[in-house]
C-alpha cells in the first residue's frame, strides 16, 4: 500500500513507534465500505508528526502526515476493505472499559477539596456524582464479566461513554467552583515535571484547571455523545 494524507488528533503519536490508520482502498460502494485498517511503523520514510498544543497547554495530541508511505500488506488488521468493522469493534471495547478507573481517580483528587467547601449544594452535587460514578464502576465490572464469557458489550458501550464523559465534565465543573478564584491562574510552570514552582492557592489547582480544559473534548472524542445517542436509538429503540 502507498499511503498519503493526514491523520489528526492522534494521542501521543510523538512517543509511538507504530500507528493504526483507516485508509481508503476502494471508492466503490457505501462510504463505510472500502476502508482498510493498517498498522504503520512510525519510522517508515514519509511519516512526520506535528504537535498540537491543547487548551490546557499540553502536548498530548498531534497531526500525523503520510507522504508516499509504503506499508506492506501483511500489516492489514482484519480483511482489506473491511477496516470499518475492525474500527467499530475496537471502539466498542474501548468505550466499555475505559472510564471507571479514571472516575475513581478524579473522585479521590476532588474529595479533599470538596471537604473544605462551605457550600452545601456543591457538596451534595459531588456526592450525587460519586454515587453515579460508582454505578459506572459496577456496570463496567459487569461488562468485563460478560466479555470474559465471550459476549459482546453491544449498545452498553455507548451508554457507558455518554454517562462517564458527562459525569467527568460535571466533576470538572465542581472542581472549578470549589477552587474559586484559584481556578483562574494559568500555572504551567507548577505542572512541569521536576519543577520547584509552587501553585497559587490550592496545590491541586494547576492539574484540576488543566483537566477542566482537556475534558471539554471528552464528549466528542471516541465517538461524540450525539452519535452514541443515535446508536442507542437504533439499537435499543429501533428508531
Predicted segments — roles?
Residues 120-123, 134-196:
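C-terminal helix-coil-helix/basic helical segment that borders enzyme active sites and/or dimer interfaces
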Residues 15-17, 34, 43, 59-65, ...:
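A generic structural signal for well-ordered coil/turn residues at beta-strand boundaries
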Residues 4-50:
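A short core secondary-structure module
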Residues 85-98, 182-239:
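Glycine-rich phosphate/cofactor-binding loops in nucleotide/flavin-utilizing enzymes
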Residues 24-28, 41, 45, 71-72, ...:
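Short, well-ordered loop/turn and helix-capping segments at boundaries between secondary-structure elements
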Residues 47-138, 218, 234:
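Glycine-rich beta->alpha junctions and the first turn(s) of the following alpha-helix
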Residues 3-5, 38, 66, 126, ...:
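Buried hydrophobic positions in well-ordered alpha/beta secondary-structure cores of metabolic enzymes
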Residues 8-13, 55-56, 217-224:
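Glycine-rich phosphate/pyrophosphate-binding beta-alpha loops
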Amino acid at each position: 500500500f502507498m499511503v498519503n494524507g493526514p491523520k489528526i488528533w492522534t494521542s501521543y503519536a510523538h512517543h509511538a513507534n507504530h500507528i493504526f490508520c483507516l485508509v481508503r482502498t476502494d471508492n466503490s460502494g457505501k462510504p463505510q465500505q472500502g476502508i482498510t485498517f493498517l498498522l504503520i511503523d512510525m519510522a517508515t520514510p514519509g511519516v512526520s508528526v506535528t504537535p498540537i498544543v491543547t487548551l490546557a497547554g499540553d502536548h498530548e495530541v498531534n497531526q500525523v502526515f503520510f507522504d508516499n508511505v509504503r506499508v506492506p500488506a501483511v500489516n492489514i488488521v482484519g480483511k482489506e476493505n473491511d477496516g470499518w468493522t475492525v474500527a467499530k469493534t475496537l471502539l466498542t471495547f474501548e468505550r466499555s472499559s475505559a472510564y471507571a478507573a479514571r472516575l475513581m481517580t478524579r473522585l479521590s483528587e476532588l474529595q479533599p477539596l470538596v471537604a473544605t467547601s462551605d457550600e452545601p449544594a456543591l457538596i451534595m452535587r459531588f456526592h450525587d456524582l460519586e454515587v453515579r460514578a460508582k454505578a459506572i464502576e459496577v456496570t463496567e465490572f459487569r461488562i468485563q464479566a460478560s466479555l470474559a464469557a465471550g459476549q459482546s458489550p453491544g449498545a452498553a458501550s455507548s451508554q457507558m461513554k455518554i454517562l462517564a464523559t458527562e459525569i467527568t465534565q460535571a466533576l470538572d465543573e465542581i472542581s472549578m467552583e470549589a477552587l474559586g478564584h484559584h481556578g483562574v491562574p494559568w500555572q504551567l510552570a507548577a505542572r512541569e515535571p521536576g519543577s520547584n514552582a509552587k501553585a497559587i492557592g490550592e496545590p491541586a489547582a494547576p492539574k484540576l484547571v488543566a483537566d477542566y480544559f482537556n475534558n471539554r473534548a471528552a464528549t466528542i472524542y471516541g465517538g461524540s455523545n450525539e452519535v452514541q445517542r443515535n446508536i442507542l436509538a437504533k439499537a435499543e429503540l429501533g428508531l
